[in-house]
A protein has these predicted regions:
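Metal-cofactor-dependent catalytic cores
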Residues: 1-254
Length: 254
């Protein structure tokens, strides 16, 4: 088994960034993964008072009319604190995230973009401080098995892009659904070690085609109908530091 791809998603719900390597820190997510998010205006979550919350409090692909988020690619420079948003490859917004005027500008941009779903107060661009805006509160890293996605694709007779699952670590060379037996086991990649803490249940976000931005495949329904569950992938928590990169070998032990 080996790593096929590594991804992080600086802004929850938007497109990800393909990585050449990742420095793993114990009990921490990928650097910058889900660092920022778009909280619903009525959630009470603000840039000044950020907090972890359930995904229902945020704009993300699970929600109808938020599909346009998959057209957006964020680039964040941690040194300058400059966030740039590209839409289909064209720059649409840029702002220094710690500047109050910049925060107002990015909020106005997303209010225009998401006016059909959050027209009163508007989305609030927020930053996580010592946590991430993940789907669960623990500092997890998401792993997706390409073989499982391929088998599901063959079963339903339709191509499924692994990008629908928004995983951090994409692996190849495992058996289909082998990862379902890894809960409470240790994954080792180079010097880094992880414990598998849970399976990942799939939600309506996976319905969205990352290329067309349309809801065209009901992935949770297909999983339930064909396998009797709605899981695809597992969550890891890092336990030992190390550097991981594509093509690195993966081992699983008790």
């Amino acid at each position: 088994m080996n790593i096929s791809e590594l991804w992080r998603f600086p802004v929850k719900g938007l497109r990800g960034e393909l990585l050449k390597e990742v420095a793993i820190t114990p009990n921490a997510p990928f650097p910058l993964d889900r660092r920022f998010a778009l909280a619903h205006g009525k959630s009470g979550i603000t840039y000044e008072s950020p907090k972890w919350a359930l995904k229902t409090e945020f704009h993300m692909l699970m929600h109808n009319l938020d599909e346009c988020l998959t057209e957006l690619t964020p680039h964040f420079d941690e040194t300058s604190r400059l966030l740039t948003i590209l839409r289909n490859g064209v720059e649409e917004a840029r702002t220094f995230v710690d500047d109050p005027r910049g925060q107002e500008e990015i909020n106005r941009y997303f209010k225009r973009l998401l006016s059909k779903t959050d027209s009163t107060i508007g989305p609030q661009f927020v930053q996580a401080l010592d946590f991430q805006f993940g789907n669960i509160e623990e500092p997890v890293i998401s792993l997706i098995n390409l073989a499982s996605v391929r088998q599901l694709s063959e079963t339903i007779g339709k191509h499924i892009d692994v990008a629908r699952f928004r995983g951090n670590i994409i692996i190849d060379g495992a058996s289909p659904w082998e990862e379902r037996d890894w809960v409470n086991r240790i994954v080792t990649i180079n010097d880094a070690t992880f414990i598998v803490v849970d399976e990942t249940i799939r939600c309506g976000a996976t319905l969205v085609n990352p290329d067309s931005c349309e809801r065209d495949l009901n992935i949770p329904k297909f999983l339930q109908q064909n396998y009797g569950h709605m899981f695809c992938g597992v969550y890891l928590i890092a336990k030992q530091e190390g550097i991981i990169s594509p093509d690195a070998s993966i081992s699983v032990s008790n």
